[in-house]
Each structure stands twice: as structure tokens, then as C-alpha cells.
């Protein structure tokens, strides 16, 4: 009996110790779950102090659990908020980049026009004095139309510039022939000879080509920046589906219900869930990358032959050169006009002398070359501005296909990619064995974590794809120097959230997008929950002791 009693006593003590340890660990783990639950602003009465039966759980694994039904429901809502927060940080950064660059470019362009107009006005006042003041509305109208084209569009630049030179010819023709009286009909006839006579030399043709190409490229580029920011803003409003929400809950908080509060989701597990929840956003990537490439093409034009700064900065000198050319060739031009339109009627003698005295044309029309050019617009140059935007555009490529990986790279969402064994796989603390699915809606049919209806693409995403496609076409036209018409992007891409998340909040200072796809490891079966629980340890020890006692009795 003594031999039998001692082992029995030792086994009994071991079982009791293991049971006490298991109870203590369970209590401790549930206490930590409760503390974290309350720290999120939830009612502590929802959280049990000790493990309870988990038959009430709908999404998280059942069995012994630290979560009540109320906790699971609130964790479900919290997981959606956590998802929105992390995705919005990624999206807001991109949105802020485009918004800030559009603002800089817009300010630069408008200030460039203001500087050019001021420079022309100052130069012409010094050069032509009263004659310019009498005709200044002609030049004001020119800049009004240029500004209107940039802000509103709906201006035919070629027709507008042709009209400017025709009106300038009428004014100049009167001045160089101030001894004659010209009716409106006669001046209209004079305008018809503008192309044939070329009274301003080759300046109108060259300037029209330069202005049209530069303005089209500049406005299209600015509109592209605005469209890009608008697309990001609309696409990035998160509205996860019910299936996505279930997967998010299981990934982020179901580990808490098992008491594993410090164990983060496996990286590939997170990747599958993000690719399922952001499936529609992945379909943007192809058209987005085409759009970025088209923007970069136009940027090259802005740095080269379509540089609007090099066109607008000397526009006063170019127009003045045209005026001087008209003055130098006024006799030949007048003779040809008189031949085509007929001889004009002379003014009375008194009015002739007074008109010549008032114009003082020959004495006042002298070229003027200001020593100081206009100050740099918006405190920068177009070259520096375009260089900066090009860098940001290159960094923005593959943004949508990289978004799931970048969300999982956030330490709040998943364990590191190298920590494959000590992570939460949706059932327990163990390696995640499923392969990572591809990006985009079509690849989600075999997603092991999120059930996605691949037959129903998001309507808002389709609208953004079309908006990008249209804008890309306009970029290519601008690259070739062709004028373009603009649609209202706010109407074309309107709609509520699509299921991808971004609300305008604080953004990181620089891009940090990872375009590398992380492939998971394939397997034929799911990973079961791992890590032996304290309760299981006590149970195994008890069984072992009972078997030992039975065998010892048989030996006796």
C-alpha cells in the first residue's frame, strides 16, 4: 500500500498543481482581454473575468473563450474602424500629394499669367505711352481669355488669338494711316488680308503655335493632378461587405477571445483578407498606371517644347516685335490693302493735323527691353515644379495593387513577414498554410478567407476606371499638341464609398509603398489551432496518472 500510495499522492498533487496553474493562466489571460476591451471604450461588464463556454460565438472559434456575445459584436464594429483607419492613412497620403501638387501648379500658372500681364502693361506704358493706354483693353481682353481658358476651358485658343491679331491690325492700320477715315466695313475688309499680308511678320503664327501647345499641356496636366486626387478620394471610402467584416473580425480580434492578446495575425493571412476586401480597388491598377504614364509624358513636354514659362515670360517682347514689324512695313501693307479694299476717304485738313499730333506714332513706337524680367511665379520655376511632380507620379505607380501588402506591412495589422510560426492564423497560434491569392476581383474566387462575389464589380470603381481612361486619352492629345475638352470629374466619378477606405486625415510625410507581391506557401489542409492550452495540459497529466495507477495495480 505504501508503494501504491506514494505515486498516487504524487500524481494527485501534480494534477492539482496543473489544474491550479491552468485556472490561474486562464484568469490572467481573460483579465488582460478585459483590460484591453475596456481601453477601447467598451463596457467592462461585457467581458467575463474567466473563460466561459463559447457556443454563443458566431464568427470567432467556439470552445472555451474570453469573449461574450456582446464583445464579439462590438469587436466586429471595431475591426471595421481599424481597417478604415489603416487604409485611410495609405490613401490620404496619396490624395494629399496630388492635392498639394495641384495647388502649387495652379498657383504657379495663375501667378505666371498675372506676371506676364503686368510685365506687358509696364513695358507698353513706357514704350507706347498714351497710345497704349487708349488701346489697353485689347491686351486686357487677351489675358482675360487666356485666364478663362485655364480656369474654365471652353475657349478656342486659335480663334481667340486670330481675333486678337485682327483687332490689333485694325488699331494699327488706323494709327499708321491717321489721315484717312475708315468705316467698320472697311476695317473688316482689312482683317481679311491678315493672313495674306502678314503685317506682323511670322510672330502671330509662331506665338499661336507656342501658346496653344503650352496652354493645352499646362491645363491638361493641372486637370490630371485634380482628377487623380478626386479618384483617390472617391475610391478610398471604405464600405466593407459583410463577408469582409467577418474576416476582419476573425483576423484582428478573435485571437483575443482565445486569450492571445499579444499574438498578431500572420502576414499571408492578412494579405488574403486585404486582397479580398480590396478586390475592386485592385482592378484600378491597370488604368491607373496608364494614366500615370500619360501624365509623365505630358510632364516631359512641359520641360521641353511646351514650357509655358518660356512662352509667357517674353510674350510682351514678342507682341512688341510684331507691332514694330507692322510699323516698319506699314507703307507696303497699306498699299496692298488700298488695292484690295479700295482707296479710303481722307479726313478734313484740320482733323488730319490734329489726328497726327494726337497719335505721335513714329516718335513713340520704339522697342523697349526691360532690364528685369517678371519675378518667378509662386516662388519656383516650372522645371523645379515638374521635376517634383514627376517623382511623386513615379512613386504612385502600382499603388492599388500594392495597397493590400502595404496595409499588412502596418505593425497594427499583422506580424512581420518573417514571423511565420508565432502568429495568429484565424484558428490558433500557428503557421498560416494557404497561398496568397492574386490582386483584383477575378482572382478572388479561390480566396480562402473572404467570400467575394466576382460577378458583381463595384459600380463606383467602374466609373473611376472610365474617368481615368478618358483623362489618359486627353493627356495623349495634349502630348501631341492637340486641344482637349474636359468633362466634370465630380459628375463622372460621383458616388458613395466603394469599399476601400480613405477619409482626409493626417498623412505620412513621404511615399512608402511596397509594390512587391508576397507569395504564401501552399498546402493541402488548413492550419489547426496550435500551442497547447493550460487546460489541455492538466487533462493530459490526469489521464497519464490514471493510466499509471491502473498499470501499477495490475503489476501488483
Swiss-Prot record:
It holds the Pfam family Glypican. It is a lipid-anchor; GPI-anchor. GO terms for molecular function: coreceptor activity. Belongs to the glypican family. It is found in: Cell membrane. Keywords: Cell membrane, Deafness, Disease variant, Glycoprotein, GPI-anchor, Heparan sulfate, Intellectual disability, Lipoprotein, Membrane, Phosphoprotein, Proteoglycan, Secreted, Signal. The gene is GPC4. Its main location: membrane. Residues 530-556 form a propeptide. One of its GO terms (biological process) is regulation of presynapse assembly. GO terms for cellular component: cell surface; external side of plasma membrane; extracellular exosome; glutamatergic synapse; Golgi lumen; lysosomal lumen; nucleus; plasma membrane. A lipid is attached at residue 529 (GPI-anchor amidated serine). It is linked to Keipert syndrome: An X-linked recessive syndrome characterized by craniofacial and digital abnormalities. Clinical features include a prominent forehead, a flat midface, hypertelorism, a broad nose, downturned corners of mouth, and widening of all distal phalanges. Additional variable features are cognitive impairment and sensorineural deafness. InterPro entries: Glypican, Glypican_CS. It comes from Homo sapiens. Glycans are attached at residues 494, 498, 500, 514. This is Glypican-4. The modification Phosphoserine is found at residue 357. Cell surface proteoglycan that bears heparan sulfate. May be involved in the development of kidney tubules and of the central nervous system. Coiled coil: none annotated. Residues 1-18 form the signal peptide.
